[in-house]
């Protein structure tokens, strides 16, 4: 009976360790998706390279930094 109890305890410990996500766990696709969704400012079609900023209309579309 003690062998069965030890086996049950080991199985419960292993299951509980794998079932609970750790704090540092992230889905593998999240960083890649964030990079895909982000448009670099210099590549934004409304970015003004002479002023090195975006007009206020483009700021609503994610272009940073904003002019004025």
From Swiss-Prot:
GO terms for cellular component: extracellular region. InterPro entries: Conotoxin (IPR004214). GO terms for molecular function: ion channel inhibitor activity; toxin activity. The cysteine framework is III (CC-C-C-CC). Its main location: secreted. Keywords: Amidation, Cleavage on pair of basic residues, Disulfide bond, Neurotoxin, Oxidation, Secreted, Signal, Toxin. It comes from Conus textile (Cloth-of-gold cone). Disulfide bonds join 53-67, 54-63, 59-66. Intracranial injection into mice causes scratching, hyperactivity and circular motion. This is Conotoxin tx3b.
């Amino acid at each position: 009976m003690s062998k069965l109890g030890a086996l049950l305890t080991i199985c419960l410990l292993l299951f509980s360790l794998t079932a609970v996500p750790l704090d540092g766990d992230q889905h593998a696709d999240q960083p890649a998706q964030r990079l895909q969704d982000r448009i670099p400012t210099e590549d934004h079609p409304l970015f003004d390279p002479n002023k090195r900023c975006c007009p206020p209309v483009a700021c609503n579309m994610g272009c940073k930094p904003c002019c004025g």
